[in-house]
Structure formats: C-alpha cells, structure tokens
C-alpha cells in the first residue's frame, strides 16, 4: 500500500468524505405515512400536482396564492414547520405501440427518435409537514413508561392528522384532478411481501440524486438511508454511488427582492438541467414577529436616505400582522443543481443564477458550509439551515406557488394507453388523448366522451396534425378483436395521401361521375326500409314540394317490391319500372324520380343517375379499416349534397357497433352546413360515446362553425379542444363562442405561426404542446397533402398501377424529390 508521511494515498479523500448517519434525523416509520425523528418530531410528506399556470387566469393564480397564505396562517404555530421541494429531473417518456401498417411504424419510429433527441424532464412538488411536540413532550418521554409515551405519540399523530386534513382539503384545488391533486406518501407492499416506502424514496433521492425504490428497513433509518459516498469540496459536491457519479452545486438567496408574487421562480421550470429547490418555513410567535418588523422600521428610520414609502410599508405590515392577514416565519432557500459533468454543471449554475436575478433576487453560490446546505434539504434538519431569513406567509406562498404543467394521462384511458406523446416548451412530456378521464383512475373499457375540436387558420399545420393523429390511432387496430374504424370526411383531398398510405379506401365524389352508391342493395331490414322510404321521398321532392300520401304509399310499395329481388337487379331504374302510372300523381312521381335513374322511364337518361343508379354498391364500412370521402365537389352541389350525405351517414351508423370508431371532419362547417350532417353531428355529439366512438372536427373558419345550427352541441360536447396559433384570432369568437379564457386567448394569439405549437384544453386544464416534424420530410410529404404532393401521388399511382402503399410510396418520394430539384 502506498504511504506518504504515514498516511494512505486516499487520506485526503477520506477527510472530505462525510459519514452521513449523524446528519440524518430520522429514526423509524411510526405509521405508513409518518416518520419519527430522534428528537420525536413527526414527519409526513405529500406530493402536490400543482396548477397549470401557463393558461391559468390571473384571478385564479391570485386566488390560489391567497388560499396558500390562508392555509399557512391557519396551521401556523411553534409546533409546525414546512419543507417544500420542487424537483426537476429527467424522466423516461415514451409509449409502447405496435403498428401493423409499415408507414405508421416508420412514422412512429422517426417521431420518437426526434423526441428522444431532447431529454424529457418532469417537475414534481413535495410538501412535508413537520410537527414538533416540543421540549416538554420530550421531558415526559424520559419520565414515563412506554404506555404513556405511546399515548402521547398517538395524540400527536391525531393532531398531525387534523393539520394534514386541512392541508389536503385546501390543496385539492391545486391540481388537474381534485381527488389526486395531493396524495400522501405512504408504504406499498409488492407481490413478494416486501414493503417499500415512498417517503424514504424521496429522502434517498435528496441524499443521492438517484431515484430508486427504498424498502422499509428493520433498523434505524439514519443508518440505512444514503447509499452514495458524499465528498464535499470548496463549492461542489460529488455524490458517488456504485452505478453513477454525480456532481452538485448549491445556490441560495443573498438578498430578497422588494416584493414577491405568485410564480416568481417559474422561469426555472423550463430549464434543461436537474435540480432540487428546497424551501423551509417555520412560523414564529406574533410577539416575536412584531418585534422583528419594529426593528426593521427603526433601522430604516435611522438611515438618512431611507425611503419614506419603505417605512410606511413596514407600518402597514405591522397592522396586517396584528390583524392576522399573514404570519411571519423563519425561511430558508436552496437550489441544488445536479449534473454528470463539472464543467456543464458550472454553466447550469450560471444559467440558474441569471434566471433568479432577473426576478429581483441576489443569488450566490454556496461556498461556506456546503454540506450544511446539502443536509438542510432533509425535512426536520433544523440545525443545518443556512442563511435563514424572516419572511411573511404571503411571500412564502409566492415563492412556493406549486405552479406546474399539465402532463395528460399515460395509461388507464378508455382505450388504454395515450394516443400520442407530444413535446412541450418545458421539456415535460404531454400524453395526449381524445378522451378526458381522471388522472389516477383506470378507465379502460369505459364509454367516455372523446369528441375533439381543432381550430386553426390556413397554414397553421392543421392538416398535418389531423393526419398525424389519424396515424397514431392505428395502434388501436390490433389492440383487440374489435379493431378500429375511422371515416375521414375530407375537403380538398388533404388526407388522401395519408389514408392511401394506411392502405385505406378513399372515395372522391365528383359531379357527373358514378359514385358507386346503390342504396337499394342494402339488406332488407326494418331500419334500412325506413331509411329508403325517407331517402327516396327526398329524391322525389321537387322545389320543397312534399309528396302526397298517395305518392308515399306508391313509393313504399315499389321499394318493398324491389327489395324482394336479387341484389344484382335492385337499381333505381328498376324501382321506377315498378311504379304504376295509372294516376297523375303516380306519373308525377315517376317524372321526379326519373332524374335519378339511368333509364328515366321516358326513353332518356336522368341527369343525376350517377349518384345512386350504379350496378353495384361499393360503399362498405362493415370491416374495420380507414375510409376517406372527399366532399370538395358535392358539398357545393345543393341538389345532390343532402341525399349523398344521408346515405353516407346511414352507412356510417352501421359501423358504430361497439368497435372503436372515429369520424373526422376537415372544414367541419362546410359539412354541417348540410341539414343531414348537421342533424347527425348534433345528435352524435351526445350519444356517440355510448357506441365507443368519437368525432373530431376541424375548421379554419370559427365564425362559420359557431354560426351552425348545431353549434351548441359542437362546442359543449367536446372533451378536448385544440387551438393552433392565430395572431388574428377574433376575441368574440374565442371568448364568447368557444369559451376560452382571456389567458388562453392571448396564448393563441401570441404563439408564432411557424412554431408548431398549439394549445390543448381538457376540462379545467390546458397546456401548450408541440408537434415539430422538422427534418422528417418523407413523412411530412404524406401527412401534408398539398397540391404539389398530390400531383406526385397521382403520378406514382399511375406508374405503379398498384394500391399497395409499399409499391407507390417509394415512387412517390422519388418523384417528389425530382420535382423539388427541378428535374420534372
């Protein structure tokens, strides 16, 4: 062994290493949720979700701030102290999805590779209540037997339960889900009977910088916690574990700003490094607090250039303290920044100090008593708190506002896993779903509302977003035996390339070209017969002139006659041949229907025969799959629009049989301008969830959508709302029509049009999310559906003569690149 001057070569390292048991105050788990320290303090911790501050109204933020101040006032006494931790750490984000379709597999792989290029981060808030029975109680422990000690402990636990109940009641408003907004950390037992403590898991992270489950030990906690070697230098610490080596540096406040407000430290929630912010607050008695304010006022009065306003502020503060508007307590702050590389850590520390100083605080690196700052992170470690300051409960509430981001729901949704993973400006993953359900509820298999509205101006990325979500839906095709059916009511062929890439069927309805529709070939069921009576009566109506009762009877007889024939013989022309012309009313009926028949009964061809008088009915949604219908042409034809709409919707209803079902409408205002679609959309908004389905509506014209007859249903019966950037957004449309808040409206207006950002709103929560597919040119070409790509797509289909996407997609990309290079 190397020795130098009688010391080992590692003596210097050994001197810097701390035996940490002496710095850990905890003795044991008193209950599943409560620890007891060696000094008989009781410790209980909750995880708090926090409020989604990005989209919260200022009034709500102020209200929550006052609620926190009121809570701290209500529980303040010399026996109560609080530790609050904001932990920003790396997290594993991702969704395990299996796609049968090759394009979807490729898209998902490329997209996840892009997401993984930036480390996902998460923010977590933990509130720890420390209850100190006091020295009198400690003396009683020494003079009484175990029974008396146990009785006292139970009394203290009951008092802690009362305080904890008040905390939980107040903080249930600080989260996405009232029931899960605050959850106490307890113990869990695994299938092998091993007990794990979530409280000890948090404490172990504070000591090691590494998140790992911690079992409840049989022995003392101070000898059990802390699996890393801790080496303290002049300004940096090293946390060395068997699996990793991490470095830590601390920041604290040297001077506080002149005022505080909710969310003053929110800028730190967007940073790209890991950290732990620790706040502690222990209220002092009113007499001591008043004496402190009086001393501060006297000191200012003795300074010649002191501002009179500051002295007045302190006088008002004394009055407010006496009135009980706030309490004052000892406060300490620290920020431990973690990293794997010392040089990068120094850069991160510099960034953090800049963010803090921008808000009026003087931040400084901790260089003295570095290990004290480290151990002061542990709740109830009173002796090690550095640089304590006197602070009001209102200021404390401003520094610890529990501001966070809405993260969506990863698992346990009605259809299982989240539909898609979206990035956010903060780096926190957002798990997107059409359905909106309780965050900690397992809602798999439940029929819940999932209707979604997408609002975005032209060029904002609406088509790409719609098609991307359509592709992500394909994971549910193989999820169970029922599969998935999607029907996309398209406009301007924006989804055609994508639907074809999914090996779906796409129907373009164009004036004068046979549609492939033949309603008379429907199975002869009561429901279909009733529908045919209604459809054919509409076809026979002339200029809003209704049919007579005799004409209705004649038509009904002819329908039933034709339905008894073999399917190959059932056509509109056949129907016409089975209407007798003994009366003028019957002859008028034949004349009207003749316009829809290949053989109009007068030796000619009806002008509209191409709509329904086709030899075979090609419309079939009975099998799970993806279907697209382009309405660009027929939606502008007032004469054919409603009959075609009626038939499409009747057939679509057949597909809503309990399988997962989604219908999408691009430029929904144009579709629901037709009475048939309007009635369908209005009714289905209310009932489609009972059939395991949902509708997705998009538009670039909010005014037209809001002016529709079924606008109320389209607005009120949506579980999810998506708003893309729109600097010209009309205030009345967004605030009065869509019921956005002022903050949400300003976010929609302020997002850059090329930022790929959008606002997702579900219930009371909203988040700014992002779908940035930059660099994914091949995938974007299929998702975007612009005019140039459509031309290349048509050429690729003509060259390959194949519907199989594996054949035409490669040719499509080659043609597209040649067109971009000017070779074609």
Swiss-Prot record:
InterPro entries recorded: CagE_TrbE_VirB, CagE_TrbE_VirB_cntrl_dom, P-loop_NTPase, T4SS_component
Subcellular location: Cell membrane
Keywords from the named record: ATP-binding, Cell membrane, Membrane, Nucleotide-binding
Domain of life the protein comes from: Bacteria
GO CC, one annotated term: plasma membrane
Main location: membrane
Positions bound to ATP: 456-463
GO molecular function: ATP binding
Stated family: Belongs to the TrbE/VirB4 family.
UniProt protein name: Type IV secretion system protein PtlC homolog
Organism: Bordetella bronchiseptica (strain ATCC BAA-588 / NCTC 13252 / RB50) (Alcaligenes bronchisepticus)
GN (gene name): ptlC
